[in-house]
Amino acid sequence: MLSHERRLWADGYERVAGLDEAGRGCLAGPVVAAAVIMPPQVEITAIQDSKALSEGQRLDARATIEDEAVAASIARCSPTEIDDRNILQAALEAMRRAASGCRPPPDFVLVDGNQWDRNLVDAPWPHETVVKGDAKSQSIAAASILAKTERDALMRDLHEAHPEYDWASNVGYPTQQHYDALREHGATPHHRQSFTLFRD
């Protein structure tokens, strides 16, 4: 999980940030991104791909990340921004915002996926994209954990005002119960109007 970071540290980059996002495929809520700079040469086995961890393991890993990170930042793009930009551009913008919020700032960023280069994100840092990076890079995995836990908590808070959509369980993702609630109650301001919210 540190091969990418070790190569960059050897090249003289001390503050290597991992970037990842959560919530691209959701019908409701923001897309949330995180940037995390971990200390050089420190490997933490609890930090793994967030999708491979239970909720409890993610929360424990988040606490470890918050204790150990040199810097961490979380950012989001709202449903309105998603509708205005499209989900891909909003996800990339959220990652750019997260990296911009790191203090101290990164001197290199590892970005999950392969869209950063393809979409010419306007960012000041040297970078490398890593497909399935949350399973290959500790820094990206740490960012995936922060983004996922932050977004899940936000959607559970929103559930209190809109329990009919079951966001406490589905956290905005497209489930049959979510589609059924949309048919019965319509969309909220938290839904992404550019997404297909209704289906037969």
From Swiss-Prot:
In the UniProt record, does the keyword Cell inner membrane occur? no
Could you tell me what the cofactor note in this record states?
A: Manganese or magnesium. Binds 1 divalent metal ion per monomer in the absence of substrate. May bind a second metal ion after substrate binding.
Q: Which reaction is the catalytic activity of this chain? A: Endonucleolytic cleavage to 5'-phosphomonoester
Q: What is its main location?
A: cytoplasm
Q: Can the keyword Signal be found in this entry's annotation?
A: no
Provide the binding site for a divalent metal cation: D20, E21, D112
Listed EC numbers: 3.1.26.4
Name a GO CC annotation attached to this entry.
cytoplasm
GO biological process annotation, one example:
DNA replication, removal of RNA primer
GO MF entries = manganese ion binding; RNA binding; RNA-DNA hybrid ribonuclease activity
Name the PROSITE patterns for this protein: RNASE_H_2
Alphabetic keyword roster: Cytoplasm, Endonuclease, Hydrolase, Manganese, Metal-binding, Nuclease
Q: Which cysteines are joined by disulfide bonds?
A: none
Question: Which cofactor(s) does the record list?
Answer: Mn(2+); Mg(2+)
Family note? Belongs to the RNase HII family.
Q: Which HAMAP family match?
A: RNase_HII_B
Name of protein: Ribonuclease HII
Native species: Salinibacter ruber (strain DSM 13855 / M31)
User: Which gene is annotated as encoding this protein in its UniProt record?
Assistant: rnhB
